[in-house]
């Protein structure tokens, strides 16, 4: 089933989003798998490389004492005042207007996924790269997308972003009709939490 899911993601869904009107725009805010590779019974994916501004130019304070210069700008570094003030070089922080831009870009990306009938299922600050210096954002890890009624979720989400109804029914088996799994509706909960954290630097 995972192979079929990936074929759908790199085939029909990729074409529908990136070969249509505005395809180039979406290429800037998604890192979407664009091919499958099979070797020795192993299955892999190919995907675009991240833009240069999604890697730390200066890293952390005190001559990069955390040794993160050149590493990916995972959203978690920017989603709390504590992380920013305690660890990050001032030149990496950007400004509040750029965090607003980031929130808008992530919202557009999620809306586009949902319009294609897809749910991310694990939307969190670990699966979004951000650059507060330029106001850019990119949704990553889209190889596990949920196609409602066809391909169920592989994961339930990341703590801090899991919708309450998913947590409430997590003790039930996946086959139980009362079990609530990640979906387009629960993506919206995760999106709201993510934007709140980028704009107010704390968890709601």
Residue ranges and their predicted role:
Residues 101-103, 110-132:
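Catalytic-loop of the protein kinase fold
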